[in-house]
Amino acid sequence: MISDRQLSILNAIVEDYVDLGQPIGSKTLIERHKLNVSPATIRNEMKQLEDLELIEKTHTSSGRYPSESGIRYYVNQLLQETSHQQQTKMQRLKDLVIENHYDLSSTLSDFANELSIASQYTTLVMRPNHKQDIINNIHLIRANAYLVIMVVVFTSGHVEHLHLASEVPLSNDELTKISNFVTAKYNEWNNHRFENELNAFVKSDTEKDFIKDMLNMIDIHFDNQSNGIFMGGKVKLIDALNESNVSSIQPILQYIESNKITQLLDEMSNTSINVKIGHEIESSLSDISIVTSEYHIDDRLKGQIAVIGPTAMNYQNVIRLLNTIW
């Protein structure tokens, strides 16, 4: 446990180090924060924080910078404070859904880019699991003799367009009947009763195969989509890392683009803000932090957001942004 003054000094060192990108000395703290104490007192308190391994001293400067433990202490205090604050939820995500005509992929891609601009860090937005949503309607449109377009409409409002290669000679009326049948029976199609209902609905094996091809395509498409990740501001992470950390950029990018990041976001899945710092993520990723939260498109459809930056991240701004997302 540290004193209130030591906590204030630790907070100031973390925030100044984020702003200035260099070790912080007692003179800088006094000038920037108008502290009404002597430099000697500040240096003594900094020595105490150093003994607690919350800050570290460089060999080339008398200043201090926060250790990973110090940043964790700072973040925990910040999360505790913000958890008691009333947050005003923004409607931007819902607005983007409408602007993109309920195209979920375009919406989440735009959302990742806008959040990256607002936070000034790299962002990831995980696509929701389609099983959270319910299919409201499936429309079939014959594009040509070889292609049928499936328009899948969900109760959340978002729409997916799938292309089914098929030369089965079905009229528009027949396609409409199949659309209505599949819409009504989609959630039952892996049930043993579905086969009986399908046999009662159509007699032709060709039409049965067409319907099964439809259902398989829908399932395969959304199983693939469930792991989709949209990235905003990829270059910001590279820019944020100092030249001395160039060697760490490649493993960081490999981590982000691998399945490991998906697994991590699943583990951190929660309605509240979660923060992982440096070695808490992986031993080779000591230079970055990941802040995650949950977003909601409606009461049913939700996914994970992550903001990725250097360990010297502006946590206050990032947490504020994620707290306002709905």
UniProtKB/Swiss-Prot annotation:
Keywords on record: Repressor, Stress response, Transcription, Transcription regulation
Coiled-coil stretches: none
Superkingdom of origin: Bacteria
Gene3D superfamilies: 3.30.450.40, Heat-inducible transcription repressor hrca homolog, domain 3, Winged helix-like DNA-binding domain superfamily/Winged helix DNA-binding domain
GO molecular function terms listed in the Swiss-Prot or TrEMBL record: DNA binding
Biological process, per Gene Ontology: negative regulation of DNA-templated transcription
Entry annotated with the keyword Transcription: yes
InterPro entries: GAF-like_dom_sf (IPR029016), HrcA (IPR002571), HrcA_C (IPR021153), WH-like_DNA-bd_sf (IPR036388), WH_DNA-bd_sf (IPR036390), WHTH_HrcA_DNA-bd (IPR005104), WHTH_transcript_rep_HrcA_IDD (IPR023120)
Protein task: Negative regulator of class I heat shock genes (grpE-dnaK-dnaJ and groELS operons). Prevents heat-shock induction of these operons.
Family designation: Belongs to the HrcA family.
PANTHER family: HEAT-INDUCIBLE TRANSCRIPTION REPRESSOR HRCA
HAMAP family linked: HrcA
Protein name: Heat-inducible transcription repressor HrcA
Species per Swiss-Prot/TrEMBL record: Staphylococcus saprophyticus subsp. saprophyticus (strain ATCC 15305 / DSM 20229 / NCIMB 8711 / NCTC 7292 / S-41)
Lineage: Bacteria, Bacillati, Bacillota, Bacilli, Bacillales
Annotated gene: hrcA
